UniProtKB/Swiss-Prot annotation:
UniProt name for this protein: Inosine triphosphate pyrophosphatase
Binding positions (ITP): 11-16, 51, 67-68, 84, 143-146, 166, 171-172
Phylogenetic classification of the source organism: Eukaryota, Amoebozoa, Evosea, Eumycetozoa, Dictyostelia
Primary localization: cytoplasm
Gene, per the UniProt record: itpa
Amino acids binding Mg(2+): 39
Cofactor, free-text remark: Binds 1 divalent metal cation per subunit; can use either Mg(2+) or Mn(2+).
């Protein structure tokens, strides 16, 4: 199949890009671009759709955007899509301390990738979820809230895990596997450019 443009993964986060490329592999025509998208508020799926529409208009072609949430069950899903702001102000220790008053430390990591073929195409959302618990921060502090999230069935936090293990179980992996299957079905795998 010949297509005219590469898929632009709109992100300024080098770690997210690295993980996405490791999970998707090299057979898809993806390049990254930093686009200043507004920080939207609302339901995670609605946020992903709107971000994707804005990115598609900005890029003028196929785009992939990602939005990640960390949801505490005791707090009815908060901080959710606002976790970036909570983390900026509270750091990993503060995220952990948010649950001091609750016995329930369960949480889930949610990743929504949204894809659009261009400005006139309705975005499609691919959700991935991993259940776990919130623990005292452990491991390197170079990737967001990874030090406080311990997936169910594991003794390590995301931050402590080898990347090869994390990249088989993470919320991002689960979402990107759906993206990968969709892109294959649309003929994006191993395509040539016009």
């Amino acid at each position: 199949m010949s297509i005219s443009k590469k898929i632009v993964f709109v992100t300024g986060n080098a770690k997210k890009l690295e993980e996405a490329l490791q999970i998707l592999g090299t057979s898809f025509p993806i390049e990254s671009k930093k686009v200043d998208l507004p920080e939207l508020q609302g339901d995670p799926i609605d946020i992903s759709i709107e971000k994707c529409k804005i990115a598609a208009r900005e890029v003028g072609g196929p785009v992939l955007v990602e939005d990640t949430c960390l949801c505490f069950n005791a707090l009815k899903g908060l901080p959710g899509p606002y976790v970036k702001w909570f983390l900026d102000k509270l750091e990993p220790e503060g995220l952990y301390k948010l649950l001091d008053a609750w016995e329930d430390k369960s949480a889930y990591a949610l990743c929504n990738f949204a894809f659009s073929e261009g400005p006139d195409s309705e975005p499609i959302v691919f959700a991935g979820k991993t259940d776990g618990i919130i623990v005292q921060p452990r491991g390197p502090r170079n990737f967001g809230w990874d030090p406080v999230f311990q997936p169910d069935g594991y003794k390590e936090t995301y931050a402590e895990m080898d990347k090869s293990i994390k990249n088989t179980i993470s919320h991002r992996t689960r979402s990107l596997q759906k993206v990968k299957e969709f892109l294959k079905s649309k003929g994006y795998e191993n395509c040539k450019f016009e």
